[in-house]
Amino acid sequence: MQTRHRAKKSLGQNFLQDANIARKIVDSLKITENDSIIEIGPGQGALTKFILEAGPESLTLVEKDRDLAPALEAEYPEARVELEDALKFDWAGLDPDRNWKIVGNLPYNVASKIMWDIAAQCNATCVFMVQHEVAQRVTSGPGSKKYGAISVWIQSFCRTDYLFKVPPTVFKPKPKVDSAVIKFFPLPEEEKPSDIEGLAKLVKYCFQYRRKQLGKILKSFISDAVIQWAEKEGVSLTDRPEALSPLQFQSLYKSVKNDFPS
């Protein structure tokens, strides 16, 4: 798509210029004719043309920039363009009977929030390009210094894979940091947590004090149930939050939910 549109810093726009990387990102999604695709922030259409070439059942482009939407509609009439902020998109309202896949070069300033919402609200395979540091955090496991609230949260709903690193030189304007492409595979519904609001609060609360021991973080909520939880899980209350797996956070919440502030 040819356009003189200047990237808007307020929207975190960095347009991908490398067709080989664009194709590699789309190939990572493994699109079939039965897939309904949502692309977040299509911008100048770097990924869009390769998505359409893959032949999905449908393609929806979620674009916040009203200056770009008309050009996208003209260039890709096969796609439906929705002028909307991905942070306000109704991810939970997607038809559960359709095979959804979501892809996008996410703006650095809102990428974590978008992924947080999508992981919990819809059952979709996703491929996202994000800031390299964020990609490391999302895909890190327990015990890693990169492991944090977003790692626990997204991995409570999805299996995550780090795919490949992307240099700043392939964007216009060039960002100051590296990017990376990651992939989410949704877990079976029966393996996902149920009380997601409570779990989210607990995870965020614990990682606010990530250098403290669990016993000190949870001192107001220590009960026989928590002590039994620690014994059952083989966890010491002298451990720090980064030692707990997503499943252990879920079982911890069940032990403290009656005392934890709603």
Curated annotation (Swiss-Prot):
It catalyses: adenosine(1518)/adenosine(1519) in 16S rRNA + 4 S-adenosyl-L-methionine = N(6)-dimethyladenosine(1518)/N(6)-dimethyladenosine(1519) in 16S rRNA + 4 S-adenosyl-L-homocysteine + 4 H(+). InterPro entries: KsgA/Erm (IPR001737), rRNA_Ade_diMease-like_C (IPR023165), rRNA_Ade_Mease_Trfase_CS (IPR020596), rRNA_Ade_methylase_Trfase_N (IPR020598), rRNA_adenine_dimethylase (IPR011530), SAM-dependent_MTases_sf (IPR029063). PROSITE patterns: RRNA_A_DIMETH, SAM_RNA_A_N6_MT. GO terms for molecular function: 16S rRNA (adenine(1518)-N(6)/adenine(1519)-N(6))-dimethyltransferase activity; RNA binding. GO terms for cellular component: cytosol. Keywords: Cytoplasm, Methyltransferase, RNA-binding, rRNA processing, S-adenosyl-L-methionine, Transferase. S-adenosyl-L-methionine binds at N14, L16, G41, E63, D85, N105. Its EC number is 2.1.1.182. It is an enzyme of class 2 (transferase). It is found in: Cytoplasm. Gene3D superfamilies: Ribosomal RNA adenine dimethylase-like, domain 2 (1.10.8.100), Vaccinia Virus protein VP39 (3.40.50.150). Specifically dimethylates two adjacent adenosines (A1518 and A1519) in the loop of a conserved hairpin near the 3'-end of 16S rRNA in the 30S particle. May play a critical role in biogenesis of 30S subunits. Belongs to the class I-like SAM-binding methyltransferase superfamily. rRNA adenine N(6)-methyltransferase family. RsmA subfamily. This is Ribosomal RNA small subunit methyltransferase A. It comes from Maridesulfovibrio salexigens (strain ATCC 14822 / DSM 2638 / NCIMB 8403 / VKM B-1763) (Desulfovibrio salexigens).
